[in-house]
C-alpha cells in the first residue's frame, strides 16, 4: 500500500481530518513560509495524535542543533530536509531522515547523487530555482523512469486528487506527499484531503 503524507499541517482539526481519513504521515514545516508552524504548536498537535502516525518535521538548511532541539521538543518521528544538506549532515540524526531532491531537466543528473545519502527515503519534488518545495507544480514523471534508487521514493510536486492515481501508476512510489494540492484558497480543504487519501488508497 502506498504511504500517504499530508504536509503543511498547522492546526489540530486538519491533523485529525487527515488521520481519520487514513493518512500515514503528517508534515510540519519549520522552515520559513506561509505553512510554518511554531514548535510549541506542533508539539501540542502531535501529543494528541495516535502513535502509529508518522510525524515529520520539514527543515531547510537548518543548524543541526536546532533541528535536534525541535525534534526532541515535538517528539518527531522523522526529519525531512529540503535544502543543500550533505550526506554527512543527514547522517547526524537518530530519527528517520527523508532527503528531498528537485526534479527538472537540468537536475536529473544530480539525482544520481541521491545514492550517497544514508537516509530512510528520498523525496522527489518539482525543481524550482530559489524555492525548496511547495510549488504546486508537477514535474515530468518520465524524467525519472530510467533512474533506479536503492532507497524508497516518496513522490511530491503538484499532486492532487485529480492526478494522484496516475502518478502512482506511472512512478509506483513508496509514498506520495501533498500540500498545495489539498488546499483551497491557501487553506487545507477537508474534502480534498479525504478525496486524495481515498484515491491514493484505491490506486493500482
UniProtKB/Swiss-Prot annotation:
EC number: 5.3.1.24
A GO MF term: phosphoribosylanthranilate isomerase activity
GO process annotations (BP): L-tryptophan biosynthetic process
Pathway membership: Amino-acid biosynthesis; L-tryptophan biosynthesis; L-tryptophan from chorismate: step 3/5
InterPro entries from the UniProt entry: Aldolase_TIM, PRAI_dom, RibuloseP-bd_barrel, TrpF_fam
Origin superkingdom: Bacteria
The entry's keywords: Amino-acid biosynthesis, Aromatic amino acid biosynthesis, Isomerase, Tryptophan biosynthesis
Catalysed transformations (reactions): N-(5-phospho-beta-D-ribosyl)anthranilate = 1-(2-carboxyphenylamino)-1-deoxy-D-ribulose 5-phosphate
Keyword Disulfide bond: no
NCBIfam families, A to Z: PRK01222.1-4
Entry protein name: N-(5'-phosphoribosyl)anthranilate isomerase
Organism of derivation: Desulforudis audaxviator (strain MP104C)
Amino acid at each position: 500500500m502506498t504511504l500517504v503524507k499530508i504536509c503543511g499541517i498547522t492546526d489540530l482539526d486538519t491533523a485529525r481530518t487527515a488521520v481519520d481519513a487514513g493518512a500515514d504521515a503528517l508534515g510540519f514545516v519549520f522552515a520559513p513560509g506561509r505553512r510554518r508552524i511554531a514548535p510549541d504548536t506542533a508539539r501540542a498537535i502531535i501529543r494528541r495524535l495516535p502513535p502509529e502516525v508518522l510525524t515529520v518535521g520539514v527543515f531547510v538548511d537548518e543548524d543541526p542543533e536546532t533541528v535536534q532541539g525541535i525534534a526532541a521538543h515535538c517528539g518527531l518521528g522523522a526529519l525531512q530536509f529540503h535544502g543543500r544538506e550533505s550526506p554527512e549532515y543527514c547522517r547526524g540524526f537518530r530519527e528517520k531522515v527523508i532527503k528531498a531532491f528537485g526534479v527538472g531537466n537540468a537536475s536529473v543528473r544530480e539525482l544520481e547523487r541521491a545514492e550517497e545519502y544514508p537516509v530512510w527515503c528520498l523525496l522527489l519534488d518539482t525543481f524550482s530555482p530559489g524555492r525548496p518545495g511547495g510549488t504546486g507544480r508537477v514535474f515530468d514523471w518520465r524524467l525519472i523512469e530510467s533512474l533506479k534508487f536503492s532507497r524508497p521514493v516518496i513522490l511530491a510536486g503538484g499532486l492532487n486528487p485529480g492526478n494522484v492515481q496516475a502518478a502512482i501508476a506511472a512512478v509506483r512510489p513508496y509514498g506520495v506527499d501533498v500540500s498545495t494540492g489539498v488546499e483551497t484558497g491557501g487553506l487545507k480543504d477537508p474534502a480534498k484531503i479525504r478525496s486524495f487519501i481515498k484515491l491514493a488508497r484505491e490506486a493500482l
